[in-house]
UniProtKB/Swiss-Prot annotation:
MF terms (GO), sorted A to Z: GMP reductase activity
UniProt protein name: GMP reductase
InterPro entries associated with the record: Aldolase_TIM, GMP_reductase, GuaC_type_2, IMP_DH/GMP_Rdtase_CS, IMP_DH_GMPRt
Keyword NADP attributed: yes
GO cellular component: cytosol; GMP reductase complex
Known catalytic reactions: IMP + NH4(+) + NADP(+) = GMP + NADPH + 2 H(+)
Keywords, alphabetical: NADP, Oxidoreductase
Domain of life: Bacteria
Annotated source species: Streptococcus pneumoniae serotype 19F (strain G54)
Amino acid sequence: MLNEFPIFDYEDIQLIPNKCVIKSRAEADTSVTLGNHTFKLPVVPANMQTILDENVAEQLAKGGYFYIMHRFDEAGRIPFIKRMHDQGLIASISVGVKDYEYDFVSQLKADAPEYITIDIAHGHADSVISMIQHIKKELPDTFVIAGNVGTPEAVRELENAGADATKVGIGPGKVCITKVKTGFGTGGWQLAAXRWCAKAARKPIIADGGIRTHGDIAKSIRFGASMIMIGSLFAGHIESPGKTIEVDGEQFKEYYGSASQYQKGAYKNVEGKRILLPAKGHLQDTLTEMEQDLQSAISYAGGRQVADLKHVDYVIVKNSIWNGDASH
């Protein structure tokens, strides 16, 4: 059993304020660098079909935000890279580990994307290690993100294989049911898992899943994440690709997991479910609100930039943050 170290999740933690050193939260710098590029926020929308399509990816890149295009339109990936590069934008795509993906990666030499994410549910695998090595051999200048993992051993192995960043999180997301279907994962202790993995990491960690509030972004950074991948908070916007559905006169958008039957089109090895989210406004409004909330967090930390969040004290409050208000 691994409970020798503290096990906690986002709602169990409160960060402790420090003396504020800026006149206004607007002075706080929320930017973060990953590889050779700097982005406005340390967040990335989940590379899922109901979160982004090519239009959303383009909007994010133009706005100075990091994005990772999903891997479920395989034939469209090379034209997508070209279209992004033609506009002077970064190309960031996902690959799997099936045999044909090796040929695909080799075809990218002529127009290599800046970022490739190797994206499988259980990323601590020989198949992922060999794909990392293949990408690094074929496209040495491409930044490789590999995942998903949930242990320090996995982080070290993927880094040693050549990964430039690792993605941590096994099934903590709102539409992921891996924890229920298999009994495995970081659901319920995702924040502690990120901390455990970050202590072993020499390269950036991307915390993936379980984010329910903007404050969770600051908490992720406190416990070692360089970037935070977010699904449900980015789903359901006007620009989101999910179908809009009307129920009793109210607008909802569908949001489903990457291993759900809705995405797979077949009921086989299903580890994702579909939910309806109340339709939100524009994606940019959420990004702006996230930026302002993170600026406030930096000011509470007594800092001026994102990295200052890494040094604040915290308490473990065991689920009492909402004071019994379960509606959150």
